[in-house]
């Protein structure tokens, strides 16, 4: 009896519970559906990006980026400088032991070792050449000139002196690059010692012109730098070729050839006009010295269009210590003095 009564009670309670209408079920279903993308209207609503639209735009941007990258690579691949630098990246560097071993083979005349030593140091040339960019020569020309200095260094390097080759080669590389800038950046070729003399005159004349109301005269310049007026007039005869000194040589026009010349105010330059016969005599006198003494004299006193070198710089160039260069210089000058005496030539005659 109790069981039947309980069932009847449950049925009555169930009937009292209201079932949701079909209309309410539909409304609930509509609310649970995902919202559709908002459409743009004339009132400036933002477009809702669908997944498909976003993917298409990203693909287009990626394709555009790839095209630009490909174009840059093609440009780099056709650039001679980039090609050369990329090739250098594959050249192995030498450690101290390898360098010493190969340098000894070069000293004995091994052509394969010579090639290996050159190729291993081409990057050193590029590194040094970068310091001379925008000074009148293209970058590849600077590298080419530096490579000539590297060849000279390889030929002259003595591995038994205790120097690293890079230290020795740097001097020769810089020397050839600087000489090329002086020689090739001019419309008229002049010897290095003449350019230096001309440099002193130009700087002095420019300074005087700024201080006085008229253009500096040879007498003004001669008085200021303590030189004979006649010598200054000889410099003025070079005026047609000297005018190119102030021509801008950098791309931005901020640097002229005169800016690339060293300031030699503290150096007593060689005479501008040297007698041809005297030059011949000097060559003959130098030829009577041995190779090492002759090389030290040439580098120390700036002969053969070289710059005057300090004892330390010459020592690096020939692979000797500073003191040893000084000793060789003294000995070489004594030999030259003896040669002059044997020919009856005095120091005063040479100076005149």
From Swiss-Prot:
Region of interest: Sigma-70 factor domain-1: 79-112
One MF annotation (Gene Ontology) recorded for this entry: sigma factor activity
Keyword Transcription regulation: yes
Sigma-70 factor domain-2: annotated span: 117-187
Domain of life: Bacteria
Annotated stretches, region: Disordered: 1-78
Motif range (Interaction with polymerase core subunit RpoC): 141-144
SUPFAM superfamilies cross-referenced by the UniProt entry: Sigma2 domain of RNA polymerase sigma factors (SSF88946), Sigma3 and sigma4 domains of RNA polymerase sigma factors (SSF88659)
DNA-binding region listed in the record: 311-330
Pfam families on file: Sigma70_r1_2, Sigma70_r2, Sigma70_r3, Sigma70_r4
Region span, Sigma-70 factor domain-3: 197-272
Subcellular location(s) per record: Cytoplasm
Gene Ontology cellular component annotations, sorted alphabetically: cytoplasm
GO BP, sorted A to Z: DNA-templated transcription initiation
Region annotation Sigma-70 factor domain-4: where it falls in the sequence: 285-338
Compositional bias ranges of the Basic residues kind: 1-38
Keywords, in A-Z order: Cytoplasm, DNA-binding, Sigma factor, Transcription, Transcription regulation
InterPro entries reported for this sequence: RNA_pol_sigma-70_dom (IPR014284), RNA_pol_sigma70 (IPR000943), RNA_pol_sigma70_r1_2 (IPR009042), RNA_pol_sigma70_r2 (IPR007627), RNA_pol_sigma70_r3 (IPR007624), RNA_pol_sigma70_r4 (IPR007630), RNA_pol_sigma_r2 (IPR013325), RNA_pol_sigma_r3/r4-like (IPR013324)
Subunit relationships: Interacts with the RNA polymerase core enzyme.
Function: Sigma factors are initiation factors that promote the attachment of RNA polymerase to specific initiation sites and are then released. This sigma factor is the master transcriptional regulator of the stationary phase and the general stress response.
Homology family: Belongs to the sigma-70 factor family. RpoS subfamily.
Name of protein: RNA polymerase sigma factor RpoS
């Amino acid at each position: 009896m109790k069981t039947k009564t309980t069932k009847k009670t449950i049925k009555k309670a169930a009937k009292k519970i209201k079932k949701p209408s079909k209309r309410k079920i539909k409304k609930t279903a509509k609310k649970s559906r995902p919202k559709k993308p908002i459409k743009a209207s004339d009132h400036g609503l933002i477009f809702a990006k669908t997944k498909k639209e976003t993917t298409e735009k990203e693909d287009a941007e990626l394709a555009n980026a790839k095209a630009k990258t490909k174009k840059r690579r093609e440009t780099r691949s056709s650039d001679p400088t980039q090609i050369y630098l990329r090739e250098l990246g594959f050249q192995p560097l030498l450690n101290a032991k390898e360098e010493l071993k190969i340098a000894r083979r070069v000293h004995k005349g091994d052509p394969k070792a010579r090639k290996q030593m050159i190729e291993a140091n081409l990057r050193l040339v590029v590194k040094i050449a970068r310091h001379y960019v925008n000074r009148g020569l293209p970058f590849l020309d600077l590298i080419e000139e530096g490579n000539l200095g590297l060849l000279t260094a390889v030929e002259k390097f003595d591995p038994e002196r205790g120097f690293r080759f890079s230290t020795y080669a740097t001097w020769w590389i810089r020397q050839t690059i600087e000489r090329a800038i002086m020689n090739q950046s001019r419309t008229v070729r002049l010897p290095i010692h003449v350019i230096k003399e001309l440099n002193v005159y130009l700087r002095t004349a420019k300074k005087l012109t700024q201080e006085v109301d008229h253009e500096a005269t040879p007498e003004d310049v001669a008085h200021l730098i303590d030189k004979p007026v006649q010598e200054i007039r000889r410099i003025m005869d070079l005026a047609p070729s000297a005018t190119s000194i102030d021509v801008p040589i950098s791309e931005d026009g901020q640097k002229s050839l005169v800016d690339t010349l060293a300031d030699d105010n503290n150096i007593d330059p060689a005479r501008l006009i040297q007698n041809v016969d005297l030059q011949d005599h000097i060559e003959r006198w130098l030829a009577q010295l041995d190779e090492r003494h002759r090389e030290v004299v040439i580098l120390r006193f700036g002969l053969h269009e070289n710059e005057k070198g300090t004892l330390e710089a010459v020592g690096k160039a020939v692979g000797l210590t500073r003191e040893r260069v000084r000793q060789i210089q003294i000995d070489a000058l004594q030999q030259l003095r003896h040669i002059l005496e044997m020919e009856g030539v005095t120091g005063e005659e040479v100076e005149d």
